[in-house]
Amino acid sequence: MTKKDKGPKFANVTTKSGEVVKVFEDLNDFETFIKNETEDEEFDHVHCHLKYYPPFVLHESHEDPEKIKDSANSHSKKFVRHLHQHIEKHLLKDIKERIKLPDLKFKDKAKEESFEHIVWKYNDVTQYHGKDFEIHITVECHNDSAIVDVDYLTKPLTAAVEA
């Protein structure tokens, strides 16, 4: 038996604009990557994407994605309620811990709903190791699947040039 690679597993995807985005399929790998980037002082230039089944969905299906109910999607009030609780109480909290900013508040929040999907957006400006940066987290669920898309983006704040 061979040793497993301990690093987070991801795929590099190049966008139309030429940006390379790391795409994860496992929540733990995603959180480990964010933690490692913070420790490597790369926390203000990160863009990655996570596509995963939320833990409450996997729990209901006894950890078998094949047994996930078709009703687990953005049209189900129960699914949306549980997903929002998961985002607020677990996902955002875990991200704050991984980037070593437990007091981050995500004051700028928004929710967009359409027939096809529901999108929650969380934005804030913060500072770590003397560097100011913006953090943007977008969570999206769709009407045809229980898979949730999370887009995580951090970018440095550009100082305003005084005239």
Curated annotation (Swiss-Prot):
GO terms for cellular component: plasma membrane. It is a peripheral membrane protein. It comes from the Eukaryota. It is found in: Cell membrane. GO terms for biological process: energy reserve metabolic process. Transmembrane segments: none annotated. InterPro entries: RGI1, RGI1_sf. Keywords: Cell membrane, Membrane. Involved in the control of energetic metabolism and significantly contribute to cell fitness, especially under respiratory growth conditions. Belongs to the RGI1 family. This is Respiratory growth induced protein 1.
